[in-house]
Amino acid sequence: MLNKLSRLLADAGISLTDHQKTLLAAYVDMLHKWNKAYNLTSVRDPNEMLVRHILDSIVVAPYLQGQRFIDVGTGPGLPGIPLAIVLPDAHFTLLDSLGKRVRFLRQVQHELKLENITPVQSRVEAYPSEPPFDGVISRAFASLNDMVSWCHHLPGEKGRFYALKGQLPGDEIASLPDNFSVESVEKLRVPQLEGERHLVIIKSNKV
């Protein structure tokens, strides 16, 4: 698996240390094993996980600004855990309402010795934002409107929303509330992944 991961990273132009590659491969191995009992992801093949979960997460890293992030609806830790591995100086709160997912996240934290993640079982509307976050990340929300509505209390004054989407969501962008605007849309290149991927970066317009 390490060889395939190295080839994918090279194709994507991403440079990581051997330790980071080992951690990413170990995470995929854990996800594959736990998935059989916990049904954490519909992706069953570890090689496919490398593309659809690992690469698809870490291509976002260059666009993140700040040190404190929250991954809302993280599920089995996506994109939060891969991002935490490639950005060791940043901290990621991994938020999910389902206990079995959070148990898996805590086991990953323990086995991989990841000190820059905090798994939390909570609904997003009940989770306090003290202190506020530099970035709110998610690939779980059905729409951008849902994301800013449910998570509006989480980012700080200069914080951003980072939404991972497939095709460019023009209708969703057009229907954003007036107090939010799109700062940029980045087309993401994920080797061996079919279909388009975009990162939509949203800021609050409040003064």
Swiss-Prot record:
Reactions the enzyme catalyzes: guanosine(527) in 16S rRNA + S-adenosyl-L-methionine = N(7)-methylguanosine(527) in 16S rRNA + S-adenosyl-L-homocysteine
Primary localisation category: cytoplasm
Enzyme class name: transferase
Binding site for S-adenosyl-L-methionine: G73, L78, V124, E125, R139
Any Pfam family the entry gives: GidB
EC number: 2.1.1.170
Keyword terms, alphabetized: Cytoplasm, Methyltransferase, rRNA processing, S-adenosyl-L-methionine, Transferase
CDD domains referenced in this protein's UniProt entry, alphabetically: AdoMet_MTases
Annotated compartments: Cytoplasm
Chain coiled-coil ranges: none
Family matches, as InterPro entries: rRNA_ssu_MeTfrase_G (IPR003682), SAM-dependent_MTases_sf (IPR029063)
Keyword rRNA processing annotated: yes
GO molecular function: rRNA (guanine-N7-)-methyltransferase activity
Entry GO terms, CC: cytosol
Biological role stated in the UniProt entry: Specifically methylates the N7 position of guanine in position 527 of 16S rRNA.
Similarity annotation: Belongs to the methyltransferase superfamily. RNA methyltransferase RsmG family.
Name of protein: Ribosomal RNA small subunit methyltransferase G
Protein species of origin: Salmonella agona (strain SL483)
